[in-house]
């Protein structure tokens, strides 16, 4: 499935601005104590602008008006960050809604009629909105499935590309784990009877849309904890600044010419000291993290799941579909007995030229790579249209052999059968070539080299699959097949290990195959001959050690483990039980996607931590700017702290508030995009965080505040 696209147009930009003002409602802002206090400060500034002498102030109306406007902009910019992020979330929900298709359904009048005997007299064509839950509909070739349901009779090839993005159709049939169908998908062949399982407005897509919208609104546990921390800091600063007011009154009683501290300037100091930057961006960071997950076509049921992905200690991976493609491809040819390389390559090529299986196509591809391209009767390379699996095959060596494809079209291709466990070709000259499982070919052949078993066992021990090849009853060699590793999977596993996540492979394959795959990609730990039911025990064992664990699954038997795991990524192509149990659903049904999800979770936590560090460092810098400016008149010794040598106290206050307000919109793109994240250890990330965002947070205010003060001097403002 193509990535869910999100586009914010001009109208939505205007909507975000409008929402920024709507969020000024105190009943809404009280949920964010930091911004609520800033809004109260704005109100105090407005009162002092209207009545400057109310608190015994000595500043001008213009000065107080400037302070009030800057405080107001601080709140508005913070609201805009949240509103813009929320619009991105809404745009994602709209993208999912665009996948919904209005369709008509053939509502059966009699559910008992045999599917092969259904005619137009047996059903009524009605709108999908009129079909009730538990009703049975008939879906013929070329029809759109009107509603989500379960196949109760028949089997059909279904195009689910609108939902999954997979162009390859899937088989849906009654019985087993492949009975679930989704409304809006198309039946390409055959016919099925479907029992509707959802009410109107409760389809799979409706649920996904609801999950996206709900997840955007819900605060995550870490965000709640951060809000509590910021609230505590805000309370401390409110008490400290309020105490300073009375301290100023005390100083005024014996310091000549000092009339006390200006309330508006104290409000400015309070706002500058509070963690307004991270308080303003917290919601935007959360929503943006959810947005990045959804853009990967993963639906997270809550922000908790995304955060948990960033905190994972262990990741359980399936072999097939996650680490390997699930396809076996030819890796080498091994001659036996009196045969040589050329004999084995030629026989393997001829027996596989019309074999449409992945293994057959990869054998042709490997033979051609070892000997150069071969021209068929039609003048086209026999492997020209091979699929991706064959493309990854590398020739182990060069073999001089004539691969004559001419005349093979007149030969008789023998397809694979479960009974013989072999396939092959009968050439027009009477030659019989067979390839297949070693024991099957061994039983078929009349001449078997003594090293057949030894060589086949060696291939099996290396994680491969041996196919024996025989010509006229004589075994001439072995074709070595290997599970095809997903491109770049070793690098991705190494990357996730750098994040401090332990990788564990659980597979039903034998020990030899499991060990070979684990060694190839660098898995930390593997479990072979593993039943899906055992996964929940593995999850519980890891959690008993105090670790967070993630896994993927698609079957009903995966559901308990998916529900138990801290991060359970269910495949959209899987069963309803799996999708309900997991806290994430991958619309692309790509198990290796969980590695990306872990990276997104890490980036979310990294972004929040980095901007928190930057915000706190900002506050420290602003403290050294404002405190000497406000108290220098009463305590001249504080002038030594004025390291920027700002022109006037009014200029210092105004420049600081300008920086405090405008740094928020400047950081919105970073909050939405996320900080650049590379897989590193926790110690390396902490060091980088402190240097880049801690150091940057200390230096940036000094640079910008001094620049603004110099601009004021040049313009003659506050002089």
Curated annotation (Swiss-Prot):
Residues 373-383 have a biased composition (Polar residues). Mg(2+) binds at residues 554, 558. Its main location: membrane. Keywords: ATP-binding, Cell membrane, Ion transport, Magnesium, Membrane, Metal-binding, Nucleotide-binding, Phosphoprotein, Plasmid, Potassium, Potassium transport, Translocase, Transmembrane, Transmembrane helix, Transport. The chain crosses the membrane at residues 35-55, 62-82, 228-248, 254-274, 624-644, 652-672, 698-718. SUPFAM superfamilies: Calcium ATPase, transduction domain A, Calcium ATPase, transmembrane domain M, HAD-like, Metal cation-transporting ATPase, ATP-binding domain N. The active site is at residue 318. GO terms for molecular function: ATP binding; ATP hydrolysis activity; magnesium ion binding; P-type potassium transmembrane transporter activity. It is found in: Cell membrane. Its EC number is 7.2.2.6. Belongs to the cation transport ATPase (P-type) (TC 3.A.3) family. Type IA subfamily. This is Potassium-transporting ATPase ATP-binding subunit. The lineage of its organism: Archaea, Methanobacteriati, Methanobacteriota, Stenosarchaea group, Halobacteria. The gene is kdpB.
């Amino acid at each position: 499935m193509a990535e869910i696209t999100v586009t914010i147009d001009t109208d939505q930009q205007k909507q975000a601005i409008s929402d920024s003002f709507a969020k000024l409602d105190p009943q809404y802002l009280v949920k964010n104590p930091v911004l609520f206090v800033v809004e109260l400060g704005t109100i105090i500034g407005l009162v002092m602008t209207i009545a400057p002498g109310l608190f015994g102030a000595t500043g001008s109306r213009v000065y107080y008006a400037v302070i009030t406007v800057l405080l107001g902009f601080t709140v508005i910019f913070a609201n805009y960050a949240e509103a813009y992020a929320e619009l991105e979330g809404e745009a994602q929900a709209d993208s999912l809604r665009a996948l919904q298709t209005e369709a008509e359904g053939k509502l059966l009048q009699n559910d008992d009629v045999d599917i092969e005997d259904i005619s137009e007299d047996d059903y009524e064509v009605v709108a999908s909105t009129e079909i009730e839950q538990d009703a049975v509909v008939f879906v013929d070739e070329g029809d759109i499935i009107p509603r989500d349901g379960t196949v109760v009779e028949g089997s059909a090839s279904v195009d689910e590309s609108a939902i999954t993005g997979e162009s390859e159709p899937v088989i849906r049939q009654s019985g087993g784990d492949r009975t679930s169908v989704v409304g809006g998908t198309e039946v390409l062949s055959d016919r099925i009877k479907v029992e509707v399982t959802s009410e109107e407005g409760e389809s799979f897509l409706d649920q996904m849309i609801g999950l996206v919208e709900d997840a955007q609104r819900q605060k995550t546990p870490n965000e709640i904890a951060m809000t509590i921390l910021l609230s505590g800091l805000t309370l401390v600063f409110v008490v400290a600044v309020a105490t300073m007011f009375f301290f100023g009154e005390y100083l005024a009683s014996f310091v000549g010419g000092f009339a006390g501290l200006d309330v508006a300037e104290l409000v400015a100091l309070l706002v500058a000291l509070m963690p307004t930057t991270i308080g303003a961006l917290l919601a935007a960071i959360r929503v943006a993290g959810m947005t990045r997950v959804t853009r990967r076509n993963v639906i997270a049921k809550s922000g908790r799941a995304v955060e948990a992905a960033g905190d994972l200690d262990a990741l359980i991976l399936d072999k097939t579909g996650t680490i390997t493609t699930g396809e076996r491809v030819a890796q080498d040819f091994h001659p036996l007995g009196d045969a040589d390389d050329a004999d084995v390559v030629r026989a393997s090529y001829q027996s596989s030229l019309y074999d449409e299986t992945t293994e057959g196509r990869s054998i042709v591809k490997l033979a051609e790579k070892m000997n150069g391209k071969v021209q068929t009767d039609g003048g086209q390379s026999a492997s020209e249209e091979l699929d991706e699996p064959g493309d990854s095959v590398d020739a182990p060596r060069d073999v001089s052999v004539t691969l004559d494809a001419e005349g093979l079209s007149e030969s008789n291709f023998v397809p694979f059968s479960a009974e013989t466990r072999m396939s092959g070709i009968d050439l027009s000259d009477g030659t019989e070539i067979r390839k297949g499982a070693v024991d099957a070919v061994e039983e078929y052949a009349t001449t078997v080299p003594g090293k057949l078993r030894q060589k086949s066992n060696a291939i099996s021990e290396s994680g491969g699959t041996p196919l024996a090849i025989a010509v006229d009853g004589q075994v001439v060699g072995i074709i070595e097949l290997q599970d095809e590793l997903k491109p770049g999977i070793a690098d991705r596993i190494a990357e996730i290990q750098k994040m401090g996540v332990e990788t564990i492979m659980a597979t039903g394959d034998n020990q030899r195959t499991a060990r070979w795959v684990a060694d190839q990609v660098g898995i930390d730990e593997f479990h072979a001959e593993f039943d899906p039911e055992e996964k929940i025990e593995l999850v519980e064992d890891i959690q008993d050690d105090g670790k967070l664990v993630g896994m993927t699954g698609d079957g009903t038997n995966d559901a308990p483990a998916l529900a138990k795991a801290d991060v359970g990524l269910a495949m959209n192509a899987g069963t309803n039980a799996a999708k309900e149990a997991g806290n994430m659903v991958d619309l692309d049904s790509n198990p290796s996607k969980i590695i990306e999800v872990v990276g997104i979770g890490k980036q979310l936590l990294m972004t929040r931590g980095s901007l928190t560090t930057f915000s706190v460092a900002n506050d420290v810098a602003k403290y050294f700017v404002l405190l000497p400016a406000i108290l220098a008149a009463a305590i001249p010794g504080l002038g030594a702290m004025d390291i920027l040598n700002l022109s006037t106290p009014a200029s210092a206050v105004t420049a600081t508030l300008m920086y405090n307000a405008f740094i928020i919109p400047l950081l919105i793109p970073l909050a939405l995009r996320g900080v650049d994240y590379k897989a590193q250890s926790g110690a390396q990330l902490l060091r980088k965080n402190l240097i880049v965002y801690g150091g940057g947070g200390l230096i940036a205010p000094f640079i910008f505040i001094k620049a603004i003060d110099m601009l004021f001097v040049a313009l003659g403002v506050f002089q």
